[in-house]
From Swiss-Prot:
Keywords: Aminoacyl-tRNA synthetase, ATP-binding, Cytoplasm, Ligase, Metal-binding, Nucleotide-binding, Protein biosynthesis, RNA-binding, tRNA-binding, Zinc
SUPFAM superfamilies per the UniProt record, alphabetical: Class II aaRS and biotin synthetases, Putative anticodon-binding domain of alanyl-tRNA synthetase (AlaRS), ThrRS/AlaRS common domain, Translation proteins
Reactions catalysed according to its record: tRNA(Ala) + L-alanine + ATP = L-alanyl-tRNA(Ala) + AMP + diphosphate
Protein name in UniProt: Alanine--tRNA ligase
Protein purpose: Catalyzes the attachment of alanine to tRNA(Ala) in a two-step reaction: alanine is first activated by ATP to form Ala-AMP and then transferred to the acceptor end of tRNA(Ala). Also edits incorrectly charged Ser-tRNA(Ala) and Gly-tRNA(Ala) via its editing domain.
Biological processes annotated in GO: alanyl-tRNA aminoacylation; negative regulation of DNA-templated transcription
Location in the cell: Cytoplasm
Family: Belongs to the class-II aminoacyl-tRNA synthetase family.
Pfam families for the chain: DHHA1 (PF02272), tRNA-synt_2c (PF01411), tRNA_SAD (PF07973)
Amino acid sequence: MTKPTPPSSVADIRKSFLDFFASKGHTVVPSSPLVPGNDPTLMFTNSGMVQFKDVFLGTDKRPYVRATSVQACLRAGGKHNDLENVGYTARHHTFFEMLGNWSFGDYFKRDSLKWAWELLTEVYGLPKERLLATVYAEDDEAYDIWTKEIGLPPERVIRIGDNKGGRYKSDNFWMMADTGPCGPCSEIFYDHGPHIPGGPPGSPDEDGDRFIEIWNNVFMQFDMAEDGSVTPLPAPCVDTGMGLERLAAILQHVHSNYEIDLFAALIQAAARETGTADLANPSLKVIADHIRATAFLVSDGVIPSNEGRGYVQRRIVRRAIRHGYKLGRKTPFFHSLVKDLVAQMGDAYPKLREQEQRITEVLKAEEERFFETLANGMDLLDSALDIQLASKALQNKTLRWFASEGREEKLVSFKDDVQVAEAVLISDELRSTEYMQRLKETVPGLNEVKTLHSVIRDWSGLTLPGDLAFKLHDTYGFPLDLTNDVCRERGVTVDEDGFKAAMDRQKAQARAAGKFKMDKALEYGGEANRFSGYDGLTESAKIVAIYVDGTSAQALEAGQNGVVVLDNTPFYAESGGQVGDQGVIHAGGARFAVDDTLKIRADVYGHHGRLESGTLRVGDAVQAEVDAALRAATMRNHSVTHIMHKALREVLGSHVQQKGSLVNAERTRFDFAHNAPVTDAQIREIERRVNEEILANTPTGARVMDIESAQKTGAMMLFGEKYGETVRVLDIGTSRELCGGTHVARTGDIGLFKVVGESGVAAGVRRIEAVTGAGALAYLQQLEDTVAKAAGALRAPAAEITGRIGQALEQVKALEREVAALKGKLASSQGDELAGQAVDVKGLKVLAATLPGADAKTLRDTMDKLKDKLKSAAIVLAAVDGAKVQIAAGVTPDAMAKVKAGELVNFVASQVGGKGGGKPDMAMAGGTDAAALPAALASVAAWVGERA
């Protein structure tokens, strides 16, 4: 019987892997999103086991004990970051696919290793003599399975001990964390052959490319304690992972992952879009890799931004764009590759095909944004490197250069002119041509040199200043790794410490300029206060500290502003976007008006305000009362923010993530990740969904639990947010989030919800403002008043004002047409009158005059009629509106060789505080000094005479 042909295409390899393990009783589990839903501390899904982490920890249980999947993974940013290596090696990627199979307390080492061998040798047809394995030095069980049961020769099974400096610190011993599930692993390697440098694993040359790891089988059989000791787990598990791209390279008989069929297609597409003929160009590899990463990120809700996952996305997109720019593509192109990616991977990942248009739009918007600054940023970077080159050359006192004829290499010594030349050359942000002109003036004999790059070719040892790298980041949108990329290509290092220092300075300035919402400057070393504001608005308390002008005090007198700290308080301190409570603190005749409540530290609240009467002293017993009306309004707006957040994700997509919020008694302001304006129809749908939840009048509920339990509830968590061991899970309608704020008891307490504003606040960030309850009523009443006033002005019922406005607009258009016709007649008559004012200058008619009340169109129309009438002329017409001046210049075709309209209009405009430009026959300008216009017009004839 003929043996079936082994699968080789990426698509076939994927399918055959899943089919194989399905035949072994495994449940095929879809790839989980790149954004981990169960771990806010992990930036991206970086392995197949991430979605099963809770199963291994024992906090989750699945309806199956065997699983297999092909997992989309990303390693860019955070601990696992391959970004800087992509494009420079054969196997580094930002995005990759991990083939895996898992056992949750079911089968163990024997089945895992035997099935791996069966799949590799019988299904994929890999030569057995090309395979070898590693095991942990003490794992005799795995060693015996390989040598005695599978039949791998002992010399091809390598024991790896504790080679990382400690007990169980080994390439072949896997740990989920410092404590918890762990165990030995067995890695399978493929030998590419002796023609490729490198030694087997465990040897001094193991980092070579000859022996490549393709599959890792992890056997979680121990639980590690804090003291480093291990005890057997009651139900050992298996976790395996094999890189799809590496396996495909082997099966397709190529050495580099970038030569496999999937990448070959993407590289062809990148070459098409950039106009590149050389398919081996490393920049094409970068672009092909990055389109996978960025498209999958968008499909999982990550859009480019300036923080967290969004910033990693931005870095990857802009790195790809820069490589396209390097290949000569100066306009957006990257988004055009999405269709090619969908053709390659859309069948395996249907969400790519479903979201193709949105992915394309997001990437195109980011490209257009970056292309606005890319060219200027590259010019600045090139100029900065030129400065470094010139400085280095001058320090060496010798320049290596080429004569323009014959390319003969010569040396020029600066001798005694070094200091002079250095002073001339080292100036900020000049261009290479300017350096060379100065250099030619300073050093005799360099007249034939054209560019600084032809003068100096040795970039080694140069360092780009950190403050300049920060300027590229801050002003031109260059991520640091992009600047590093450019510099590395030229052998230049970047002063990253200087970059960080500049970044820290800017952050410090931003903090100083803003209202810092935690009074860390107050020196309070006492105990934490107890917050009772979830349960009530009044509290009997004792004053434990008083601050006046930032300094600790024992008493506060009438008329003084200060900060009061209580042992217990019902006042909510500003946090999580919700403003601090207002109210009063009183005792006897003393009354302290609380204007704001801020945190002194996480568990201590400071009550800011003014003592209106009496005296308050440390130790006094007081009554604390929150302003009930303000608190109720704030709670309505905070609670509706949660419901709105969920509605936004339902209407706009799961990519919507909170980027900031402000909740007070007047309104809620919510900033979120989204790349396009929210349409009127979408806003209506969001309003409908939110008000539907309000009308349901369901109870809200808050539960305090540990962070792991909260993760299991599916509560929304914000990546990068620092959560404590104990968190508060809030249920409002169908929304579930972690929140420490104050909220309504039932959704019906919110009242009416109405969106009052939608706008963009930053690249990829939109803002919605909304009102509730009495605020919503006031907003609608104000709109009614506006409609009533408009109806009165139009003398029409409110229901008919849109029709009446349409009629009025048609009347306006008709009047505008009449005015335009009259202006045309006026221009014709004025042209006849002005033609007689032209003077003859060397055979050319010259006219400079004003047209009172003319607009730009009238100036142009009159100009055309005058040119027809005068035949051979140079004309300047101007009009004045207050202090502003409009100027038009025109030159007939026969005179353009001597007089250009653009030069003429600038000559006049420069005298009236303005500038302008245009074509040789017609140009426009503006000015701000009407008083200088008569003299400017009087000078036109002489100016033309010098050129005629």
